[in-house]
Amino acid sequence: MKTSDITLVFQGAFKSYVTRERDAFVRNIRMTRQVLPGARIVLSTWEGTDVPRNAGFDTVVLSPDPGPLAPLKLDDDKANNANRQLASTRAGLAAVRTPYAVKLRTDCFLEHAGFLDFAAEQRRRDGGRERLLACSFFTLDPLMFERLPYHLSDWFHFGPTELLRAYWSAAPMDARDARHYEQRPHPPGASIFERRFRARFAVEQHLCTQFAGARGYACPRALNDTSEAVLRDHARFMAHEVMLLDPWQIGLVFPKYAWVGASRFQCMNNLMHLDWVALQGPELAGFQDAAGLRRLIRERARSKRLTALAFRHSRLLHGLLFDPQHSSEPVRRMVSRLARHL
């Protein structure tokens, strides 16, 4: 694959200056251009945005802003931008004329293009079949703390342009679904994290369930539906339709979320690349050092199993540990130290 076969779609808000949050949008574009010098770059943002001529884009797509929805979570005041992300990504992908595309946000950049090497290796293992390549961070493990099946990270996607267009062809989230849990209780047994949701589904689930459902996979009927059929098909979907890479394997740098990589909680909560490798089956055909990988998989599976067990049996402490209204830093530090030994 040549870099000229790829178009990078940067979607989202864009400002020509460095913001108070230290977002440097123009820098992100220029650094990514150095990594993939032959690729085209599309900016998909909102009408009225000031885009300098020398910002480094080949194409700029300006769309009407569909506006926000009610905050995604009951204890949050940040707007739910599901439909904004959907509209800007779809418009950007519509402008792509190359066989392959990358979707990423305007507030991140690439420091290398290792994802191309991983994708090529997997394509060979699959006999030429294509997959959707996505980031592990915030691809949630439905067996851990936030049991949200089909919560596939939307930070970074790579694959055939038509595959990305299909994934991002989901119907918009309507206002009723955005306020689903304002009017009804959460399902019995919902964890402290699941009970925070106002929307019927997380944004990532809203997208992924429509894509997976159209391909015959059993999808959740509720936010944390972990029925046997859903979990079975979720694992099958991740194993056969997706490739998960960790950000450092992709080459993805997301300054806003730099803390995630150091978080033991997120390391357990997410489906990391090694978890995805485990879904490929015990033989690990085509993978280098399969014996070493199997050992790492066993160690991680044990650690996640013990962590999930500890989480379930500490339910009475969850309010103290995880309620943002309470100061529980000493308790969290103690639990974190214990978790390192699991």
Each language-model region and where it sits:
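Catalytic core and acceptor-binding pocket of nucleotide-sugar-dependent glycosyltransferases
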Residues: L110-D117, Q122-P282
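Active-site-proximal specificity loops/subdomain of glycosyltransferases
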Residues: S44-A95
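Short aromatic/hydrophobic "clamp" motif used to bind/position activated sugar donors
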Residues: A101
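Active-site acidic Asp-centered loop
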Residues: L104-R105
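Short loop->beta transition adjacent to catalytic acidic/histidine clusters or analogous donor-positioning motifs
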Residues: S4-I6, R33-L43, D58-T59
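Short, well-formed alpha-helical segments that are part of the catalytic scaffolds
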Residues: Y17-V35
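Membrane-proximal basic amphipathic "stem/tether" segments
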Residues: S263-L342
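A conserved hydrophobic helix/loop-capping motif in glycosyltransferases and polysaccharide synthases
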Residues: I6-T19
